[in-house]
């Protein structure tokens, strides 16, 4: 309904008028799903095995370190029921599994395909994906 959309847009605009500074504090925050998806997308890029192997990730030396608040857990679940990218194997035929990327705020793993795993001296995590005309590369499946 165009009228309803207009009303919601006006309400959002009015709420942003007359901003004011607030004192610094530790407070709980609720993020819009789009913002959360963006944060997870940036995390996925930062823990991508290719970037780690090239030395270009800002999380290069963060394995085992707290990179989020202690109550944050991010899981990549390639077997999630009705997940858009659910599959038993990655694009290179490597079996995949549900894996904690972030557990209690701590970085637990890189996402790797065979190539990046070989470059890092590690095993593939079964996270290779590919497009129709591209080589495989590391990618998350269904991050939650």
Range-by-range predicted roles:
Residues 1-144:
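N-terminal small-residue-enriched
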């Amino acid at each position: 309904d165009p009228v309803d959309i207009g009303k919601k847009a006006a309400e959002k605009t009015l709420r942003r008028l007359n901003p004011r500074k607030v004192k610094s504090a530790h407070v709980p925050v609720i993020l819009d799903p789009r913002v959360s998806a963006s944060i997870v997308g940036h995390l996925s890029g930062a823990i991508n095995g290719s970037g780690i192997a090239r030395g270009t990730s800002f999380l290069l030396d963060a394995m085992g370190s707290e990179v989020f608040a202690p109550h944050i857990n991010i899981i990549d679940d390639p077997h999630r029921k009705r997940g858009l990218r659910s599959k038993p194997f990655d694009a290179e035929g490597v079996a995949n599994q549900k894996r904690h990327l972030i557990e209690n705020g701590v970085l637990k793993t890189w996402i790797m395909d065979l190539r990046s795993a070989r470059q890092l001296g590690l095993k593939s995590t079964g996270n290779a994906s590919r497009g129709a005309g591209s080589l495989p590369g590391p990618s998350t499946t269904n991050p939650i």
